[in-house]
């Protein structure tokens, strides 16, 4: 659905540009890897911080650049749009193992030429045992080796990738320009007492910052020269004028402050792009775009330098350019990040720091531009609050109707107080933005990696608890073991064993994350990212060393609903009503419900026990009780930046499992809720597939019983409706009322919608050529349906239509 009558259509050239980008096959790109290798080889005598700065300098000064015929913005990540650069300093392991498999994947396919394969093989020897993954794995203690061997903790994203889940200080960048950062760095460097041992690392850091600022300026000047060269050859007068203006802008920003809307957009794009050339961490987000860009928009509109149509076309160009950024993941990593997502989040709406509605004219323009482009990037989030502009809320619902899973809605009424309770200043709490999927942070002030990556698998752990601490799938011991299910005379015994085991597993997850974070801090400091995050320059530390103002990490879990439903079935059918014996249930699980008698047990588990998502306290409270040990335990453990400067340095809970419910399900045996072995688990805090039978209000009530004020890392809720359900204005108003109740009264944290019919999805599986730009909401992000694996497609189809 396009609804051009409501939102208007892309300009002809932006429509053509969009199609060109969508038609690009994603290829593996070796250029960055070659340049990075050369830089590392040339600077082996340098401290790692300086070596990383010189690496970025080498890349930005030598990488291929181009300006597309239809673009209004300059800047590219790779030799072609949608190509995925390689980051060998993180790992070459999966790249070499999968060189001949990238094109054969059943999802997240990448293409690769024989020349590229050889180029990557040529540089590989230098990186053997000389990258983050190698050093991280060597650093890990034996105590957690079993979890890495079995893939229980999903650390692929941390060992293979860089800085992620943050937004730099775009308002300050636009106001001061990088020249302002340069001046502050020079002043800090000049003020150091070099007899103080603490000044040694600071000296190196400040010099590295100056290197990358100059490198960014050089990069922009290369585009300025290219735009001028293209202008000289351009026959069309209007396009020649555009190229000359682009040349002028690139000669100015981001080094100098932006003074117009066009300059501000180009400056932001350069930084957003270069951060993802420096490092391949995903979820590099734009922050509160409508707030920091509005002064430039307003001034240009008032002066007559800009029309609304000009701004709209420029933003659609920005979003198309945003889609060109790509990332190659290992096959294992794609199981938790299906659809090649980059999670580049744009946040609009919300409140000002003086607690007024923050919606402005640019908020509407951003909505319209995203509606016109209908792409998977950027990830659009709207901050909801009880006084949100009603017309703006109406427009949000209209965008949802388009069926590409945006915008997601975050609730100020729960998130802001939660941040304040954790020690975030009130002013900063009111300025939060979405980072990546559902995670939130204060843009420009938040530390490295605001989300955990270990994905504690609740249903798999429950089976482990029932098996005296031994994992059913691998046969390995995960936790100490507190008895077998057959010997547990009461439900309280099972819950006591669950409590102790979950705390133990939580501790193991922290060990893994801290050791890998320390390896990342030592091996791959990212200098530009640090420089653009407050207060790294003031402290003389990288973001991974504790340079940010705040630093909190949220833990992640998978299968919350399966856990609750499993406990519900065990309590009711085994212990309370004694319709199934402990031995019968355990044997049925081991049999995967295959025999006729075990199929009957499966039927009872599915049909005769309360299910999460139906506003039934019997099961909802079990979910809350079983989750409580994790919430309590995770906050006990500091992260590697604790007491090194930032406010916080600790952990809290979060439920964003992205698409790990599919990958983690592949390693999980049959569960007591009646789920078959190796099928997907429930995602986020959403009910299990087809378990919610009483409509969306009941789902909202079940989800809201979770202690959302303590799950500050995000409470991700996916919902699905058919397009027909929102066809009438009356039904759209009903949805608005439902969301208001969820947020205002029930204190829900987040909700997002897939507005697509089951029939459309099934037809897209059968006839993918007819649905090349069909977009679905996977978890806290949207993806093109056709690039997803069959397992993930089936998982999305199976989600209940409300």
Descriptions of predicted regions:
Residues 230-240:
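A conserved hydrophobic secondary-structure block that centers on an alpha-helix together
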Residues 2-206, 242-245, 249, 253-802:
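Conserved catalytic cores of very large enzyme subunits
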Residues 207-218:
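Extended non-globular scaffold/tether segments
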Residues 228-229, 297:
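Extended, structured, electrostatic nucleic-acid-contact surfaces
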């Amino acid at each position: 659905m396009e609804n051009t009558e409501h939102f208007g259509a892309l300009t002809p050239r932006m429509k053509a540009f969009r199609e060109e980008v969508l038609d690009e096959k994603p290829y593996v790109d070796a250029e960055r890897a070659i340049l990075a290798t050369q830089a590392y080889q040339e600077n082996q005598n340098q401290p790692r911080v300086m070596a990383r700065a010189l690496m970025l300098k080498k890349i930005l000064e030598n990488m291929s650049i181009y300006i597309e015929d239809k673009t209004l913005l300059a800047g590219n990540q790779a030799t072609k749009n949608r190509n995925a650069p390689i980051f060998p300093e993180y790992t070459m392991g999966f790249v070499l193992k999968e060189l001949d498999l990238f094109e054969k994947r059943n999802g997240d396919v990448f293409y690769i030429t024989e020349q590229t394969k050889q180029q990557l093989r040529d540089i590989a020897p230098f990186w053997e045992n000389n990258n983050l993954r190698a050093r991280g794995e060597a650093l890990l203690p034996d105590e957690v080796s079993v979890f890495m061997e079995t893939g229980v903790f999903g650390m692929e994203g941390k060992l293979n990738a860089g800085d992620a889940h943050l937004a730099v200080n775009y308002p300050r960048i636009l106001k001061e320009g990088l020249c302002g950062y340069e001046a502050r760095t020079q002043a800090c460097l000049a003020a150091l007492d070099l007899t103080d041992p603490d000044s040694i690392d600071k000296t190196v850091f400040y010099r590295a910052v100056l290197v990358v600022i100059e490198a960014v300026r050089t990069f922009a000047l290369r585009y300025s020269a290219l735009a001028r060269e293209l202008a000289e050859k351009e026959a069309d007068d209007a396009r020649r004028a555009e190229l000359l203006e682009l040349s002028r802008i690139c000669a100015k920003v981001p080094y100098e402050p932006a003074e117009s809307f066009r300059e501000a957009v180009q400056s932001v794009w350069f930084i957003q792009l270069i951060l993802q050339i420096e490092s391949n961490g995903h979820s590099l987000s734009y922050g509160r775009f409508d707030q920091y860009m509005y002064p430039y928009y307003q001034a240009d509109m008032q002066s007559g330098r800009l029309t609304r149509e000009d701004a709209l076309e420029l933003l659609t160009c920005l979003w198309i350019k945003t889609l060109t950024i790509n990332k190659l993941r290992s096959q294992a990593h794609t199981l938790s990040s299906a659809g090649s997502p980059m999670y580049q989040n744009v946040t609009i709406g919300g409140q000002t720091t003086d607690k007024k509605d923050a919606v402005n004219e640019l908020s509407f323009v951003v909505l319209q531009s995203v509606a016109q482009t209908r792409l998977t990037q950027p990830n659009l989030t709207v901050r909801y609050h009880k006084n949100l502009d009603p017309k703006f809320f109406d427009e949000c619902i209209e965008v949802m109707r388009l069926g590409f899973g945006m915008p997601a809605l975050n609730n100020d009424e729960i998130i802001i107080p939660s941040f304040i309770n954790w020690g975030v200043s009130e002013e900063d709490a009111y300025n939060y933005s979405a980072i990546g999927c559902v995670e939130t942070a204060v843009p420009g002030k938040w530390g490295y990696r605001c989300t955990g990556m270990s994905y504690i698998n609740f249903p798999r752990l429950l089976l482990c608890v029932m098996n005296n601490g031994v994992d059913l799938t691998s046969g390995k011991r995960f936790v100490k073991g507190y008895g077998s299910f057959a010997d547990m005379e009461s439900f309280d015994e099972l819950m006591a064993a669950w409590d102790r085991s979950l705390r133990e597993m939580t501790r193991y997850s922290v060990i893994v994350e801290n050791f890998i974070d320390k390896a990342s801090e030592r091996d791959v400091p990212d200098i530009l990212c640090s420089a653009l995050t407050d207060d790294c320059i003031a402290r003389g530390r990288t973001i991974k060393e504790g340079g940010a103002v705040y630093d909190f990490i949220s833990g992640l879990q998978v299968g919350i609903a399966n856990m609750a439903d499993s406990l519900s079935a065990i309590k009711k059918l085994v212990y309370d009503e004694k319709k199934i014996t402990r031995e019968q249930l355990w044997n049925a699980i081991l049999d995967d419900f295959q025999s006729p008698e075990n199929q009957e047990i499966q039927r009872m588990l599915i049909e005769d026990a309360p299910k999460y998502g139906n506003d039934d306290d019997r099961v909802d409270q079990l979910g809350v009780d079983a989750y409580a040990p994790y919430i309590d335990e995770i906050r006990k453990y500091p992260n590697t930046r604790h007491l090194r400067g930032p406010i916080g340095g600790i952990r809290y809970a979060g439920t964003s499992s992205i698409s790990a419910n599919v990958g983690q399900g592949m390693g999980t045996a049959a569960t007591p809720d009646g789920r078959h072995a190796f099928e997907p688990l429930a995602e986020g805090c959403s009910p299990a597939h087809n378990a919610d039978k009483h409509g969306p209000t009941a789902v909202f009530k079940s989800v809201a019983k979770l202690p959302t004020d303590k799950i500050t890392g995000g409470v991700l809720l996916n919902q699905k409706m058919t397009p027909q359900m929102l066809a009438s204005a009356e039904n759209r108003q009903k949805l608005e009322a439902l969301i208001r109740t969820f947020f205002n009264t029930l204190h829900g944290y987040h909700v997002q919608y897939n507005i697509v019919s089951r029939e459309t999805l099934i037809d897209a599986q059968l006839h993918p050529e007819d649905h090349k730009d069909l977009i679905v909401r996977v978890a806290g992000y949207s993806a093109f349906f056709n690039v997803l694996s069959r397992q993930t497609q089936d998982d999305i189809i199976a989600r209940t239509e409300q």
